[in-house]
């Protein structure tokens, strides 16, 4: 029973995560066909799913080690009732995610064209889509860590619920934005699909973070978690 109570919600999270990733495959080509040929629509979708999304997920591999290690450490501290250790480990892991995510996000946005030309020369036209997608990196990485923390403290259904809500919002935005010609509206077409993914991850993170803060009464120092990382990243960018 204990194994099932943990594995079932984790499976739900994986299912909803997979469904969210497949929303584009179900809606993008169909929406793009409103203002371009099917062949051109498939090419645009290929740039979004095959090139852009591949590059955006690279920073996740660096952050995954911290998120994975957090679950058993959190479970052990929670079982002992050591709330201070729980809070300390969560805050440290979130800070690490920020310090990984922000430089990756800014660097990829600034050098989007060069990265695409180097790795995928045929997809250089996807620069703007890539830049929009990169905005979601910081949300994805912190979402990984916060989701792991929620599993660690026993709130295993929250990530699945958050992903379901985020997926619904992404589907609505895809159906609304993708059919719009991006020559008429800059954030239409595949740019709309990229933006909907960013908003989806932002919504998921917001829900998870609100629950985590409510459960543990976490307080994040603005100077440490926002101001200093932003100053460092802006200095790097300049």
Where are these regions (language model features)?
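Helix-loop junctions and terminal segments of transmembrane helices
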Residues: 60-80, 84-87
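Membrane-interface helix-loop junctions in multi-pass transport and translocation proteins
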Residues: 1, 157, 167-205, 238
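Interfacial transmembrane-helix starts/ends
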Residues: 3-4, 49, 82-99, 103-111, ...
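Transmembrane alpha-helical segments of multi-pass transport proteins
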Residues: 14, 224-238
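Alpha-helical transmembrane segments
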Residues: 146-155, 208-226
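Interfacial segments at transmembrane-helix termini and the short loops linking adjacent helices
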Residues: 91, 108-138, 187
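Alpha-helical transmembrane segments of polytopic membrane transporters and translocases
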Residues: 9, 16, 41-63, 95-96
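Membrane-interface junctions at transmembrane-helix termini in multi-pass inner-membrane proteins
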Residues: 135-165, 175
């Amino acid at each position: 029973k204990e194994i099932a109570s943990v594995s079932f919600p984790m499976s739900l999270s994986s299912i909803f995560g997979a469904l969210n990733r497949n929303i584009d495959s179900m809606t993008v080509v169909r929406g793009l066909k409103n203002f371009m040929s099917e062949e051109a629509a498939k090419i645009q979708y290929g740039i979004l799913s095959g090139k852009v999304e591949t590059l955006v997920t690279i920073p996740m591999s660096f952050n995954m080690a911290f998120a994975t290690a957090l679950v058993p450490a959190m479970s052990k501290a929670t079982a002992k009732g050591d709330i201070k250790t729980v809070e300390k480990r969560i805050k440290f892991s979130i800070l690490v995610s920020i310090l990984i995510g922000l430089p990756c996000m800014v660097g990829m946005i600034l050098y989007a064209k060069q990265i695409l030309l180097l790795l995928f020369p045929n997809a250089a036209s996807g620069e703007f889509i890539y830049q929009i997608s990169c905005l979601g990196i910081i949300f994805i990485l912190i979402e990984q860590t916060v989701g792991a923390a929620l599993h660690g403290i026993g709130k295993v259904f929250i990530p699945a619920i958050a992903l379901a809500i985020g997926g619904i919002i992404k589907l609505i935005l895809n159906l609304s934005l993708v059919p719009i010609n991006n020559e008429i509206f800059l954030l239409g077409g595949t740019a709309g699909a990229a933006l909907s993914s960013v908003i989806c991850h932002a919504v998921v993170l917001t829900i998870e973070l609100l629950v985590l803060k409510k459960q543990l009464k976490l307080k994040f120092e603005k100077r440490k978690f926002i101001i200093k990382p932003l100053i460092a990243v802006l200095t790097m960018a300049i």
